UniProtKB/Swiss-Prot annotation:
Domain MGS-like stretches: 1-145
EC code(s) of this entry: 2.1.2.3, 3.5.4.10
Protein family membership: Belongs to the PurH family.
Species: Burkholderia pseudomallei (strain K96243)
Cited CDD domains: IMPCH
Any one GO molecular-function label of the UniProt entry: phosphoribosylaminoimidazolecarboxamide formyltransferase activity
Name listed for the protein in its UniProt record: Bifunctional purine biosynthesis protein PurH
Length: 521
C-alpha cells in the first residue's frame, strides 16, 4: 500500500496535478529543491528531503538524496523481517512510491554553446541511484519515470485502495532500467566523442563507444522470408516525418517487407516539392512522377512499369483525394502512404480492407545515422541527403542542355539516388520512363532500363538519363543514346571521363556532371 511518495523531477509536466491527487488519497509527500517549492506553492503539504533526513543539501545540490534514510526506505524488502526491523531500529519509514525524472543531459548537449563543464553538471547522480533502487525493489515500490504513467498509476491506486499490482510495478521498473540505460548511453556517446581539446574542441559524429536505443513497436509475423523471425523497433528520438511515425488507418498488419519498402517509398516521395507519387517494388522505384495533383502523378508513375507496380507500395506527398483513390483501387496494392486521406478517399478503400493505409505527417527530419550490420560489426555513416542544386552542375559537353532538358535531368538525378546500384534512369516530362536497377554492370542497367520503357510502350526519344555513378566506359553511354536519350547527368570522376565526354560530343548530346555519387546497396 502506498503511504509515502518521494517526488523529484526536472520535467515538471503534470506533476502538480499528480501530487494533488496523491495527497487527496492520503499519501505523504517528500520532495527536493525546485520540485518541493513548486508543490508547496501549489498549497500541498510537502516535506523537504533535507528536513526528512536531518541532513542539508550540500555541494551545490550534488548531494540531496544520497542518504540511508532515503535509500533504506526504498530498498527494504517488506517481506523480510530483518529488513523491517532494521528500518524500525533506525527510524526509517518506507518510501512506497518514487517519482523521478533526470537532469536534461541530452537537451543540454544539443545546444551549440554547450561546454564540457555544462554537460558534466547535467549528469544526474542522485536521480538514477534512486530510480535503480526502486526498480530493483519493484515488488514493494512503485517507480514512475515517465509523466505519461501518472494517470495509469492514479487509476489503479483509486481502484485498489492505494495499491498497485505486481505486473504494473514490473512494467514501470522495466521502463526505469531502459531509461537509465539510454541516459548512460547518451553520456558515454558524448564523452567518447570529444577530441583532445576537451574544453573547446569539436565533437566527432562517431564516438569511440556507440550506444543506440530503440523501443519495440511490434513483433512481425516473420522477417524478409517466412523462416525468419522479426520485430519492428522505433528510434527513441524518432525524427519528424519519419516512417516510424505512421498511423495505420486500415488494412492487415504490416510485414517486414512492407515496412522496408514503405520506407524507401516515403523517403523518395517526400524529397519532391510538386505533387508526387512513388511506386516501389523490392525497395526500388518502378515508377516516379510529379503532376498537377496526386491523381495525375499516380497515372504517370503507374505508366512507367504497370507490370512491376502490381502488388507494390505507393506513396504520395499530398493528400489522397477521391479521384486518386479510385485510380489506385483499380490495381493490387499492398500499402498506400500519404500525409492524409480525404474522407471520400477512405470510403473508396472500405471495400478493400486488406489495403494498408498509412498516414505520416510530412517533415524534413532524418535519422542521425545510416546503419548496416556486417558479421560481428556495424557500418555507420551519415545519410545520403545531398540534393544537387542547378548552380552546382558543370556542363562538360559542347552542347548545353535546354531548360526543359535541365528540368528532366534534375528530376532523373533525384530519382536515381533511390535506385539500387548500378542505377540508370530514363526520365521525361516529370516522370520515369525506364529504370534499370541493381545490375553488376552499368551497361546492363542501361539495356534493362530501355527494355522496360519499350515493354511499357513509352518512347525514349528526347529523354534524359541519370546514372548514379560515373560511366567507366563509353559503352553505357552509347546504349542510352541509341535508345533515344539527348542528355545525361552523372557524377563524373572516371579515369576515362575524356573518352565518355568525347562520345557525348560525337552523339551531339548534352552532359552535365554533379561531382556527387549516389551508390545505394
Amino acid at each position: 500500500m502506498i503511504k509515502q511518495a518521494l517526488i523529484s523531477v526536472s520535467d515538471k509536466t503534470g506533476i502538480v496535478d499528480f501530487a494533488k491527487a496523491l495527497s487527496a488519497l492520503g499519501v505523504k509527500l517528500l520532495s527536493t529543491g525546485g520540485t518541493a517549492k513548486l508543490l508547496a506553492d501549489a498549497g500541498l503539504p510537502v516535506t523537504e528531503v533535507a528536513d526528512y533526513t536531518g541532513f542539508p543539501e550540500m555541494l551545490d545540490g550534488r548531494v540531496k538524496t544520497l542518504h540511508p534514510k532515503v535509500h533504506g526506505g526504498i530498498l527494504a524488502r517488506r517481506d523480510l523481517p530483518e529488513h523491517m526491523q532494521a528500518l524500525e531500529a533506525h527510524g526509517i519509514p518506507t518510501i512506497d512510491l518514487l517519482v523521478v525524472n533526470l537532469y536534461p543531459f541530452v537537451q543540454t548537449i544539443a545546444k551549440d554553446d554547450c561546454t564540457l563543464a555544462d554537460a558534466i553538471e547535467n549528469i544526474d547522480i542522485g536521480g538514477p541511484t534512486m530510480l535503480r533502487s526502486a526498480a530493483k525493489n519493484h515488488r514493494d515500490v512503485t517507480v514512475v519515470v515517465d509523466p505519461a504513467d501518472y494517470a495509469v498509476v492514479l487509476d489503479e491506486m483509486k481502484a485498489n485502495g492505494n495499491t498497485l499490482g505486481y505486473k504494473t510495478n514490473f512494467r514501470l521498473a522495466t521502463k526505469v532500467f531502459a531509461h537509465t540505460a539510454q541516459y548512460d548511453g547518451a553520456i558515454t556517446n558524448y564523452l567518447t566523442s570529444l577530441g583532445d581539446d576537451l574544453q573547446h574542441g569539436s565533437r566527432s559524429a562517431y564516438p569511440a563507444t556507440l550506444n543506440l536505443a530503440f523501443d519495440k513497436v511490434q513483433d512481425l509475423r516473420y522477417g524478409e522470408n517466412p523462416h525468419q523471425s522479426a520485430a519492428f523497433y522505433r528510434d527513441v528520438a524518432t525524427p519528424a516525418g519519419a516512417l516510424a511515425n505512421y498511423r495505420q488507418l486500415q488494412g492487415k498488419e504490416l510485414s517486414y517487407n512492407n515496412i522496408a519498402d514503405s520506407d524507401a517509398a516515403w523517403e523518395c516521395v517526400k524529397t519532391f516539392d510538386a505533387p508526387a507519387c512513388v511506386i516501389i517494388k523490392h525497395a526500388n522505384p518502378c515508377g516516379v512522377a510529379v503532376g498537377a495533383d496526386a491523381g495525375e502523378a499516380y497515372a504517370k508513375a503507374f505508366q512507367t512499369d504497370p507490370t512491376s507496380a502490381f502488388g507494390g507500395i505507393i506513396a504520395f506527398n499530398r493528400e489522397v483525394d477521391e479521384a486518386a483513390a479510385q485510380a489506385v483501387a483499380k490495381q493490387f496494392v499492398e500499402v498506400l502512404i500519404a500525409p492524409s486521406f480525404s474522407d471520400a478517399a477512405k470510403q473508396v478503400f472500405v471495400a478493400k480492407q486488406n489495403v494498408r493505409l498509412l498516414e505520416i505527417a510530412l517533415g524534413e527530419g532524418h535519422n542521425a545515422f545510416d546503419l548496416k550490420r556486417v558479421g560481428g560489426g556495424l557500418l555507420v555513416q551519415s545519410l545520403d541527403s545531398k540534393n544537387v542544386q542547378p548552380r552546382e552542375l558543370r556542363v562538360v559537353t559542347k552542347r548545353h542542355p535546354t531548360p526543359k532538358e535541365m528540368d528532366d535531368l534534375l528530376f532523373a538525378w533525384r530519382v536515381a539516388k533511390y535506385v539500387k546500384s548500378n542505377a540508370i534512369v530514363f526520365c521525361g516530362n516529370g516522370m520515369t520512363l525506364g529504370v534499370g536497377a541493381g545490375q553488376m554492370s552499368r551497361v546492363d542497367s542501361a539495356r534493362i532500363a530501355s527494355i522496360k520503357a519499350q515493354n511499357a510502350g513509352l518512347t525514349l526519344a528526347g529523354s534524359a538519363v541519370a546514372s548514379d555513378a560515373f560511366f567507366p566506359f563509353r559503352d553505357g553511354l552509347d546504349v542510352v543514346v541509341a535508345a533515344g536519350a539527348t542528355c545525361v547527368i552523372q557524377p563524373g570522376g572516371s579515369v576515362r571521363d575524356d573518352e565518355v565526354i568525347a562520345a557525348a560530343d560525337e552523339h551531339n548530346i548534352a552532359m552535365v556532371v554533379t561531382g556527387v555519387r549516389h551508390f545505394r546497396h
